[in-house]
Design a protein with these regions (language model features):
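Active-site neighborhoods and metal-handling regions in enzymes and metal-associated proteins
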Residues: 1-376
């Protein structure tokens, strides 16, 4: 895709790089359009993409996955190089290609947070006069702003995720287990994802709702339990991430009031989202509000979403990113009452030219705490 290639070359100039060597699964998918499944499950099956200012990009892929690369990728078929994983070292093929491109004394950007020590040593031995630098920031910046095809995938997928969550709440009863809720969610997810996968199943009830990423167990749902459900998964390689909280039976006054405050924190944060706004400002306003209520602010209340579940920009106090049009954010304030329960509300939001647009949170009203039947 020309837009991706042009964007990479823009990053080459901005970060003063002569070449970019891409290896992480998410960035391989971004720069090639193909998802190679065994790149994740078999670590030795490297996929390596190389681009320079003057040379057309090439991609190196294990021979058994070459058909997938050819079928899914927008790369020129002539630029796809396959290797035998038992007789060839893909890093050496990449190094030879860099030499062919005249990169022996140039500045080469790589994802050093991903590159193994063995591969880094090989790069230094074979290209002793090249400058190998960390290009993680360049990749983060490339994926900050979503292209239209990315937005189409994210929005189409996420638009149905609320139905899955509220369908599970409607099917659940006191006396069932967390695993029963997960089964309802899994079945609903399979229907909308059409073959793609759910990751990190998060269902927690009662005191287990305090566990931010707790997997479902055989714990039985009891009247009065707070139940927190976070649905995360992929379709066409792009993530959805949406969370809701419910109570088994009628909420107490305390539960309803706590939820009302969480909704206000969530809505106030989203109301600030528009191009030019500082993520740190959004977080600091949230933290001030939570502190006034006597709640403990969590470390972040939002993150980017796309080919990975959590990506830049984060909404926290540690980084200050200026929001730009076509960023996709998840806004997710969380309130945990230690030893008792945890409340969370999460929605996906698109930054638009003049403000924002809710991607989730439009199908079912979230202003009232959702309920699960307590009559068994």
């Amino acid at each position: 895709m020309k837009e991706i290639t042009d964007l990479q070359r823009k990053m080459l100039k901005k970060y003063h790089l002569d070449a970019m060597v891409t290896m992480t699964p998410e960035n391989i998918t971004y720069v090639t359009g193909a998802y190679i499944p065994t790149q994740v499950t078999v670590r030795s099956r490297k996929v390596i993409h190389i681009i320079t200012e003057k040379h057309d990009p090439v991609v190196i892929v294990v021979n058994i996955e070459e058909p997938i690369m050819r079928a899914q990728s927008w790369m020129d078929p002539k630029s796809i190089i396959s290797y035998n994983e038992f007789t060839q070292n893909p890093m050496m093929i990449a190094i030879d290609k860099l030499k062919e491109f005249g990169m022996e004394t140039k500045r080469i950007g790589m994802e050093l947070s991903y590159l193994s020590a063995i591969d880094m040593d090989l790069m230094h031995r074979e290209l002793p006069h090249a400058e190998i630098v960390n290009a993680d920031a360049a990749y983060e910046e490339m994926r900050f702003i979503k292209m239209q095809f990315e937005l189409d995938r994210i929005i189409s997928f996420a638009s149905n995720i609320e139905e899955v969550i509220y369908g599970a709440f409607a099917s659940a009863r006191a006396g069932m287990t967390e695993k029963d809720i997960y089964r309802f969610i899994s079945n609903g997810f399979a229907e909308i994802a059409k073959g793609d996968k759910m990751s990190m199943p998060m269902v927690g009830s009662g005191v287990r709702s305090c566990l931010l990423n707790g997997e479902p167990t055989d714990k039985v749902l009891e009247k009065g339990d707070i139940v927190r459900v976070d649905v995360m998964g992929t379709k066409d390689n792009y993530y959805c991430d949406c969370c809701r909280t419910a109570v088994v039976g009628t909420p107490t006054e305390h539960q309803a009031e706590t939820w009302s405050k969480l909704v206000k924190a969530h809505d106030d944060a989203i109301a600030q989202i528009k191009p030019g706004v500082s993520t740190k400002t959004i977080y600091d306003n949230f933290a001030r509000q939570f502190t006034e209520w006597g709640f403990k602010p969590v470390a972040f209340i939002g993150h980017g979403l796309g080919l990975t579940l959590h990506e830049e920009p984060y909404i926290n106090t540690y980084k200050d990113t200026t929001l730009r049009e076509n960023m996709v954010l998840c806004v997710e304030p969380i309130h945990v009452i230690d030893g008792e329960c945890g409340y969370q509300l999460e929605n996906e939001v698109l930054v638009t030219a003049d403000g924002h647009r809710m991607i989730t949170g439009t199908r079912h009203p979230y202003q009232q705490l959702a309920t699960i039947r307590a009559d068994g």
